[in-house]
């Protein structure tokens, strides 16, 4: 192996270790959950998952905000709402999220997760909202125990009703206001 190859390998190893340290920190730091839980306490009784209303959109926006702004890099977050209206949350890499190394979120709570799951929400930080092949496999594997699934992306919400297999795609577009100043004599 020449010196250049050795240097590249050393840099790759350092990047890998930094990524591992960064992931460990993301898993152990639970402060990102607080704003989500706080908003949940205010609006949990009125959530409309498949056809999100203003309150639901505000809650979903907070989840997406945490996934893109709280961590060192944009990280996927998943939030599960069980049949008792309890939240179960985990954080992952920019491209994948699971409960690996975060099992306490599922089993270390006062009240364990109860099926069916009302909604499985996860983010695609800084990307479009879409259901990937992995996402569809997750939806299919929970068939009968999952009522709805939502993917949050950059200015987008993709909500899916598992029973009807109907989805709703919402895209937020910032437009100019269209306002102009009315001068004397115009109306």
Regions flagged by a language model, labelled:
Residues 2-119, 126-187:
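Conserved beta-strand-loop surface patch within small alpha/beta domains used
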């Amino acid at each position: 192996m020449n010196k250049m190859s050795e240097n590249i390998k050393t840099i790759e190893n350092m990047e890998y270790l930094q990524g591992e340290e960064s992931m460990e920190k993301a898993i152990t730091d639970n402060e990102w959950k607080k704003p989500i839980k706080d908003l949940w306490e205010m609006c949990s009784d009125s959530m409309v998952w498949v056809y999100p209303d203003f309150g639901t959109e505000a809650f979903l926006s907070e989840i997406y905000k945490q996934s893109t702004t709280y961590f060192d890099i944009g990280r996927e977050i998943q939030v599960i709402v069980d049949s008792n209206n309890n939240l179960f949350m985990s954080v992952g890499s920019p491209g994948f999220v699971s409960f690996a190394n975060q099992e306490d979120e599922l089993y270390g709570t006062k009240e364990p997760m109860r099926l069916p799951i009302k909604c499985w929400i996860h983010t695609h930080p800084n990307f479009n909202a879409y259901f990937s092949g992995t996402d569809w496999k997750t939806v299919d594997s929970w068939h009968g125990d999952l009522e709805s699934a939502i993917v949050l992306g950059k200015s987008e919400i993709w909500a899916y009703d598992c029973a009807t297999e109907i989805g709703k795609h919402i895209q937020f577009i910032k437009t100019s206001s269209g306002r102009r100043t009315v001068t004397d004599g115009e109306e």
